[in-house]
Amino acid sequence: MEKNEEFFDIRELISIMLQAFSYIDEYAKKVKEEKVENKMFIKEENEKFTELDYLTQTLLVNTIHKFYGNLNIKIIGEETLNEEYNKIIIDPNNEDKKEFLSSIDKISKDINFNFPPEFNLDSKRLKKINNSEISFFFDPIDGTKSLLKKKYYPVTTLLGVRIDNMPFIGFIHFVFDKENKTFFNFPTLGIYEYNPLLKIFDKKEIKSDENKFNFAISSTRATKEMIDFIKTFPNSEYENESGLGTKMIKCLLEDKIYFTTGKNSVGLWDICAASCLLNEIGLDIYCFNGEKAKFIPKKIYFDSNGVICLTFYKFKIKCFI
């Protein structure tokens, strides 16, 4: 290894994020049990977010800066962190919030997880990053619409990491799930699930039938025509709930077809996190014009006036806009 070479240790990143997710889960549990208040706010274009969204993003941003601030990094999250919201939401006199945000001090880059043996190969876990731009894209709480209705299962934290212009590693973490599972890809080795209760990493067998369609659809409006179209598919389920991460995992692991509506737009964080996992099993996301989805650092990647559709078919995925 040359003296000036810089490497990105994937196991280290996974360790850091799994620790961060565990603290998010602890605070989210208090929200669910109504031990802490979770106020709602409305930002531009009538988009709603809660204190849990904002606090989670603050923790993730600070964690990334703590461990990777010395690298050429770019961070893009769904929520906008600013002084106005800091004064309202991050109350230094609130012990629960103070404890949650101070949990960053407990997060370590030490690799304390019992990774599978295949994760230990230097050629697999180290990525050369000399002069590379490392971008972190995340939706701190994907499924706010469901959360506000106290429907917790669709709620996830999405994190996608891009090195230069290529999606590299993605995380889909189930915040309110009773087992708080995390799904992620380990580049070149497949898709894994981490169960913090059992403390094990499980490589997932992806269900794929080239003659079958699986859909995860988001739309700005659930029209009668669209719902009628959905009903024409056998073994389909329609859910008027948010949570792209949940639908992604269901489509990959279950022998069902899932539909969801109600999302106003798809952020870069959604596309990047999903692409990292899908690329791992030989799938790509394509735009309607047939081009592969690009990862351009904009606030919103796609504005959907119609239907966004991830189509699993013959090992291709198309994103219809």
Set out the residue ranges of the language-model regions.
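Tryptophan-centered short beta-strand motifs
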Residues: 167, 201-205
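Short helix-loop capping/hinge motifs at secondary-structure junctions, enriched
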Residues: 190-193, 198-200, 314-318
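Detector for glycine-centered tight turns/loop "hinges" at secondary-structure junctions
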Residues: 145, 165, 196-198, 290-292, ...
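DPxDG-like acidic metal-binding loop motif
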Residues: 124-192
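An extended, acidic
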Residues: 204-321
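N-terminal subdomain of lithium-sensitive/metallo-dependent phosphomonoesterases centered on the IMPase/IPPase/PAP
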Residues: 1-141
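Short, Asp-centered acidic motifs that coordinate Mg2+ and/or phosphate
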Residues: 74, 169, 257-259
